[in-house]
Amino acid sequence: MKIKYNVIWIDDEWTKMSAFKDECEVIHGIHLEPFTTQKNGMEELDRNLNSWDAVILDAKMFDESEDETPKLDGLRKAIRHIDQLSMKKSIPYFIST
């Protein structure tokens, strides 16, 4: 299927959900670009803001490093960052648990 949407996906366990990623692309035309930390995902969003249509956020995620314990701090920072970008482009985000 032709890609309709490009979505940043921030989840510390995305590698365990490859079937979900494949289904999104093949059946729904949603390309998910995974990141394990909020820092890396938000840096990509900043670099290529106009290329992204949405963001999926894991409720408990790594903030800046995979050496951390996943917790809500990364989620709060990501939401705050996305909200700050709304003056440039409104990006919908979805929280997954």
Which residues does each PLM region occupy?
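A short, hydrophobic beta-strand element within the central beta-sheet of small alpha/beta folds
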Residues: V55, R76-T97
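A general structural motif
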Residues: K2-K4, N50-W52, S90
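Acidic, metal-coordinating helix/loop segments flanking the phosphotransfer/catalytic sites
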Residues: W14, K21, E33-D58, F62
